[in-house]
Swiss-Prot record:
Molecular-function GO terms, alphabetical: ATP binding; ATP-dependent protein folding chaperone; isomerase activity; unfolded protein binding
Keywords: ATP-binding, Chaperone, Cytoplasm, Isomerase, Nucleotide-binding
Domain of life according to the entry: Bacteria
GO CC field: cytoplasm
Main location group: cytoplasm
Primary enzyme class: isomerase
Oligomer and partners: Forms a cylinder of 14 subunits composed of two heptameric rings stacked back-to-back. Interacts with the co-chaperonin GroES.
Species of the source: Roseiflexus castenholzii (strain DSM 13941 / HLO8)
Family of the protein in this entry: Belongs to the chaperonin (HSP60) family.
Catalytic activity: ATP + H2O + a folded polypeptide = ADP + phosphate + an unfolded polypeptide
Protein's job: Together with its co-chaperonin GroES, plays an essential role in assisting protein folding. The GroEL-GroES system forms a nano-cage that allows encapsulation of the non-native substrate proteins and provides a physical environment optimized to promote and accelerate protein folding.
PANTHER family according to UniProt: 60 KDA HEAT SHOCK PROTEIN, MITOCHONDRIAL
UniProt name for this protein: Chaperonin GroEL 1
Length: 543
């Protein structure tokens, strides 16, 4: 297929147009005074959302070159969302500012590679500054504040804080839709492993791309299963008592996987195959954890057991198993309570005796998975669009709260980024053009506060100047502007806080993608094919 090419300034301008379209749509949602965006759906009611990444993902532009710029900015939001689940709008605002300021410098003759190098040095200084001023999250009130800000709803904040306190920071919390209009919460014992289904054909819920099996039998082995003959005896025995079977193995492929998928599609058996978590000796230990939790037996040739010798008594049980592409959760394993407690005590003893920090960390993860619980938050609303919007906010708030517990908090409302600017004075540059990269980030770090003020109907420049003046007068770096009340004050005391991980990820991802965009010199895209018009019908033909 023939290609069309753009070079130099023309290429960068096309990318900028795409970046601006996405950023202008996304940044209107920033902050508690941010607006909603309504997204048309081919079927059903439109989706109304306050979530930056949801807006960004929906944008597809007709011009292929502009669309490249748009997709790069979508990547900023998506990457930030994947890592921390929040801060996507902040990352988008930062990236747009870096791109716009950077393109001015490049057009004026600065070297884009040196600008990028300056940006990379500057972002390291900002991240170090953010970490140095982080305040650890110690109590439930702090978690409630963080979650409430993310969701713009104090009820959601209190709910998430309560659930996190109940299951512990190592527990698993999932968000589901409720049939009622109020929030509901359920607590269940369970274990989550970081391996999902081997094939998407095992999915039972296409909307959520999840495989859900109720009351399944569970085969646990450390062997790779390629031949169906290996598991045929246990399959036949299992089919006499249930259709639901979960297989946890080193791998399932070839004929065995094909047979399971075909029989699943035919409805003969509702199977789910999951790869075993971990590697080496740790994998065997984790498989043994699953076996004890579910009351099954680990089938391993190391202990003289082959797959074809497995019986129904060797299979574990659980009330429910849920698997997506990344994780699998075993809910209410039917294992013996005394055996589970003994296993927990055994792991605790290993934690106390180990001298390796890495081993201690992995043992603590296993302990959390065995001892931790699973909480289900059910979100209710009066209408379908409101339900989806509220569910998005709860998911974001949950991710934000977890991030706060991990790395601590900083003052919110763009204050942390504003007060990190002096750290850029200490950045050592080798070449003159690297200074431009530092200058670009200096300006970009003001942009989130500027946009927050703009969304609240205020002049961003005036707000930033006032905040700086008050910080200097009162010698308090936590002073900022509360866009909800229109007051200036200590953001920590007002409960306006952001997790360090969210703020840090937003800056790092914005600089990463914007740097790539600034150093782009050529764009290549397919020339769209013109579809021939339909032929006109011949004379005398009756239609």
């Amino acid at each position: 297929m023939p290609k069309q090419l753009y070079f130099n300034e023309e290429a960068r301008r096309a990318l900028k147009r795409g970046v601006d379209i996405v950023a202008d749509a996304v940044k209107t949602t920033l902050g508690p005074r941010g607006r909603n965006v309504s997204i048309d759906k081919k079927f059903g009611a439109p989706t109304v959302t306050h979530d930056g990444v949801t807006v960004a993902k929906e944008i597809e532009l007709k011009d292929p070159f502009e669309n490249m710029g748009a997709r790069l900015l979508v990547e900023v939001a998506t990457k930030t969302n994947d890592v921390v689940g929040d801060g996507t709008t902040t990352a988008t605002v930062l990236a747009q500012s870096i791109v716009n300021e950077g393109l001015k410098m490049v057009a004026a003759g600065a070297n884009p590679m040196l600008i990028k190098r300056g940006l990379d040095k500057a972002v390291e200084a900002v991240v170090a500054e953010l970490k140095s001023v982080a305040i650890p999250v110690r109590d439930r009130a702090d978690i409630a504040h963080v979650a409430a800000i993310s969701a713009a709803d104090s009820e959601i904040g209190d709910l998430i804080a309560e659930v996190m306190e109940k299951v512990g920071k190592d527990g698993v919390i999932t968000v589901e839709e409720s049939k009622g209009i109020a929030f509901e919460k359920e607590y269940t014992e369970g274990m989550q492993i970081d391996r999902g289904y081997i094939s998407p054909y095992f999915v039972t819920n296409p909307e959520r791309m999840e495989a859900e099996l109720e009351d399944p039998y569970i085969l646990i082995t450390d062997k790779k299963i390629s031949s169906i003959q290996d598991i045929l005896p246990v399959l036949e025995k299992a089919l006499q008592v249930t259709k639901n079977l979960v297989i946890v193995a080193e791998d399932v492929d070839g004929e065995a996987l094909a047979t399971l998928v075909v029989n699943k599609l035919r409805g003969t058996i509702n199977a789910l195959a999951v790869k075993a978590p971990g590697f080496g000796d740790r994998r065997k230990a984790m498989l043994q954890d699953i076996a004890i939790l579910t009351g099954g037996t680990l089938i391993s040739e190391e202990i003289g057991r082959k797959l074809d010798s497995a019986t129904i008594e060797d299979l574990g049980r659980a009330r429910r198993v849920v698997s997506d592409k990344d994780n699998t959760t075993f809910i209410e394993g039917r294992g013996d309570e005394r055996a589970i407690r003994a296993r927990i005590e055994q792991i605790r003893a290993q934690i106390e005796t180990t001298t390796s920090d890495f081993d201690r960390e992995k043992l603590q993860e296993r302990l959390a998975k065995l001892a931790g619980g699973v909480a289900v938050l059910k979100v209710g609303a009066a209408t379908e669009p409101e339900l989806k919007e509220k569910k998005h906010r709860v998911e974001d708030a949950l991710s934000t709260a977890r991030s706060a517990v991990e790395e601590g908090i900083v003052p919110g409302g763009g204050v942390a980024l504003l007060t990190a600017i002096p750290a850029l004075d200490r950045v050592q540059v080798t070449y003159e053009d690297e200074k431009y990269g530092v200058q670009i980030l200096r300006r970009a770090l003001e942009e989130p506060m500027r946009q927050l003020a703009r969304n609240a109907g205020e002049d961003g420049a005036v707000i930033i100047d006032t905040v700086r003046r008050l910080q200097k007068e009162k010698n308090d770096k936590n002073i900022g502007y509360n866009v909800l009340t229109g007051e200036f004050g200590n953001m920590i005391e007002m409960g306006i806080i952001d997790p360090v991980k969210v703020t840090r990820s937003a800056v790092q991802n914005a600089v990463s993608i914007a740097g790539l965009l600034l150093t782009t010199e050529a764009l290549i895209a397919d020339i769209p094919e013109e579809k021939p018009a339909a032929p006109t019908p011949g004379g005398g033909m009756d239609f």
